[in-house]
């Protein structure tokens, strides 16, 4: 060393819990070779077996799959699923371990640290420790294990020699564990579940975890089952404040959804988040959006009260009225339009169209026609039935409550949620 500076200062990372200094420690890790897995997934994506809804994120997924490095799946943290890897203790004397015990047996190459609770943290290699401590005692208090890169291990326990083995303390990368969710939850559940539900029709998640969770599920799911775990991926964006800024506590612009529900209702929150949203794009939202959605739910209630009152006060007129045909054509077109938008996963656009048509056509025009005896009671009632069915995915609580209150006025089905999706405006209930 040519020169030292005793006044030199540097930054040292500290544990956020105990404030002990943290120092980088190069260690052997476990990896998955991803190139063969990625090539198989890419081949199926190219064949059209997967559709990504999300503003160009299909290209992002393709980029990740074609530029993958081997995947490090081992983590040196406590919380997680321990790697199913075992070492033969006597055959691996260079494995370093640290364990808790009530006993203190010092020796060459053994480090002992006393704790306030009367226990000791003992560290050393198995070769140095086993003459002083039993393997059972080491395993019972095991805190960490560091194996050399070339240490021999086994992946399946043998009951005959399990007492001579010690398990790896590393845990799986959380994305590796969660990547198995689509098939692991079905394979070990009720008989027939896997065959019926795998592959899933749609996965909905945020675009920010596309390369972490979605891609990992594709790699592992296809490797284990030979099939992609889902046929479509719908990616939503981040929810930002009304100025388009990311929400954070420091900025003070965080919207608490529970406060919104208490003030405007769960349906208002749901509709405000969905309307005019675009897959893969961030969405700005603010107080005005919640108010507008709340006003929509009020409008639905008012329309339902009108129809209920209509059935209480007026007699049925079976004669065609001037606006009947125009109304039927309009509602049939709306059913076709909304169904098509939902089939294309243009959910935000569907909500926007429904808001406009329910408010400005059904409430502002059709109800006025009915008041002026230009539209039959039967059709305005059927129109409300269809509107409730179309609006139900977006405002489920209000529409279901209204359906229950109106009863047979709008249909014989007990639940709106299980009623058949409308195909056209029929003239019978």
Positions of predicted regions on the chain:
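Structured ligand/cofactor/substrate-binding pocket environments in proteins
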Residues: 53-90, 120-125, 132-133, 169-176, ...
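Acidic, turn-prone loop/beta-hairpin segments
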Residues: 87, 165, 241, 274, ...
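Proline-centered turn/helix-capping motifs that create local helix->coil transitions or kinks
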Residues: 225-227, 304-317, 407-411
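Flexible, glycine/threonine-enriched loop-and-boundary segments that flank and lead into catalytic domains
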Residues: 71, 128-172, 180, 184, ...
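Residue patterns forming the tRNA-binding/recognition surfaces of aminoacyl-tRNA synthetases
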Residues: 1-96, 110-118, 125, 245, ...
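Gly/Pro-rich turn-and-neighbor structural signature
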Residues: 64, 68, 73-75, 79-175, ...
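Conserved oxyanion/phosphate-binding beta-strand-loop segments in alpha/beta enzyme cores
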Residues: 20-43, 161-189
């Amino acid at each position: 060393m040519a020169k030292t500076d005793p006044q030199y200062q540097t930054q040292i990372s500290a544990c956020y819990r105990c404030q002990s200094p943290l120092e980088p420690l190069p260690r052997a890790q476990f990896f998955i070779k991803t190139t063969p897995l990625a090539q198989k997934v890419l081949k199926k994506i190219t064949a059209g077996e997967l559709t990504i809804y999300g503003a160009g994120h299909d290209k992002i997924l393709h980029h990740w799959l074609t530029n993958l490095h081997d995947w490090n799946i081992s983590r040196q943290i406590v919380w997680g699923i321990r790697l199913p890897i075992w070492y033969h203790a006597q055959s691996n004397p260079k494995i370093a371990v640290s364990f808790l015990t009530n006993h203190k047996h010092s020796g060459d190459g053994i480090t002992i640290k006393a704790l306030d609770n009367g226990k000791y943290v003992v560290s050393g290699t198995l070769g140095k420790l086993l003459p002083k401590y039993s393997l059972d005692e080491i395993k019972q208090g095991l805190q960490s294990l560091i194996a050399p890169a070339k240490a021999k291990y086994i992946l399946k326990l043998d009951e005959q020699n399990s007492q001579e083995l010690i398990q790896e303390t590393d845990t799986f990368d959380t994305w590796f564990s969660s990547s198995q969710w689509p098939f692991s939850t079905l394979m070990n559940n009720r008989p027939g579940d896997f065959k019926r539900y795998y592959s899933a029709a749609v996965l909905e998640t945020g675009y920010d975890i596309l390369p972490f969770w979605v891609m990992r599920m594709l790699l592992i799911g296809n490797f284990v089952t030979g099939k992609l775990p889902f046929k479509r991926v719908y990616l939503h964006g981040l929810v930002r404040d009304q100025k388009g800024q990311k929400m954070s506590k420091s900025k003070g612009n965080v919207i608490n959804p529970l406060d919104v529900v208490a003030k405007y209702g769960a349906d208002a929150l749901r509709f405000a988040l969905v309307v005019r949203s675009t897959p893969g794009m961030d969405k700005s939202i603010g107080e005005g959006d919640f108010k507008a959605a709340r006003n929509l739910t009020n409008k639905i209630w008012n329309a339902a009260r009108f129809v209920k009152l209509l059935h209480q006060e007026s007699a049925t007129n079976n004669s065609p009225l001037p606006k009947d045909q125009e109304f039927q054509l309009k509602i049939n077109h709306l059913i076709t339009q909304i169904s098509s938008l939902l089939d294309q996963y243009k959910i935000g656009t569907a909500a926007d169209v429904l808001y406009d048509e329910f408010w400005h056509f059904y409430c502002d025009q059709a109800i006025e026609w009915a008041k002026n005896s230009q539209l039959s009671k039967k059709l305005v009632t059927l129109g409300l039935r269809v509107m409730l069915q179309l609006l139900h995915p977006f405002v489920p609580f209000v529409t279901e409550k209204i359906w229950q209150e109106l009863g047979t006025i709008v249909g014989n089905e007990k639940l709106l949620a299980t009623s058949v999706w409308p195909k056209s405006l029929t003239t019978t209930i």
